Amino acid sequence: MIRNIIIIFFSFVLLACQEQSQNKIAIVIHGGAGTMKKENMTPELEESYLLKLEEAIRVGYEILKNGGSSQDAVEKTIHIMENSPLFNAGHGAVLTSDGSAELDASFMNGETLNAGAVAGVTNVKNPISAAIAVMEKSPYVLLSSKGAEEFASDVGLELVPNSYFITERRKTQLENIQNKNEVAFYDSYIKDSKYGTVGCVALDINGNISAGTSTGGRSNKKWGRLGDVPVIGAGTYADNECCGISATGWGEFFIRNVVSYDIAALVNYKNLNIKEASRIALNKVKDLGGDGGVIVLDKNGDVSMDFNTAGMYR
């Protein structure tokens, strides 16, 4: 059984040192963690994942290399993944019990500690941009559902029909789950259907850290279920004083443990390195029965990519 499973936590990291200022720039991304059956992870599909992740991180890296902000790098990097059918975010997101897509995203600016998030949106092409707009153009941190969609329209974000997000792969996945008469956390493509969530953390030449995360949530979800992604401190956190974090995993457990903030607090207040802090936070999730992973980037440009699942693909 185990031999028929491939564990994946697709993650990439790029680091560089600017010659003029010697300030380090860095960017790290993930495309989700989980367990994929061997028959579903063909060499061609694996190559597609890797190429898309490489494309995404190159976009963000070029922004940083040219002196751009970590915020811009995170947003544009996540756009690439949201626009791809490969990931559980934007186009290609998992479907709710009624066959529609409901999307969540969050963003945090480590310089100002400003943050924004949207939850349960159904017509915003790039939810990460909506999250940033909430941060920049509203007095709020989190907007949901119809209100978030109205706000996105008011600020001029691109809107699309819900059918844009729906792919045959996800329709088949939902049908398979519903035929088993279960609100499944696991599915035939990826063990945790939230895995596939995308995230990015970046450090720019000015020492500013930004973090963002985007997801379609959980396949066959009901009743407006929300996970950790739109919850600042659970799925996303950033603070220039310590680090930035983007998480992927069993959202209910990440909310209960406030995983992203917990990592930042352990670094900030106990002076732990990001590897130690990540391990402690994820072990707490595991102790409660949850699993998942995080990418963490600290103010020095050091990176940690940790998980408490059975394995990790890098």
Where do the PLM segments sit?
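Bacterial Sec-dependent N-terminal signal peptides
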Residues: M1-N23
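Alpha/propeptide regions of enzymes that mature by internal proteolysis
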Residues: Q20-R314
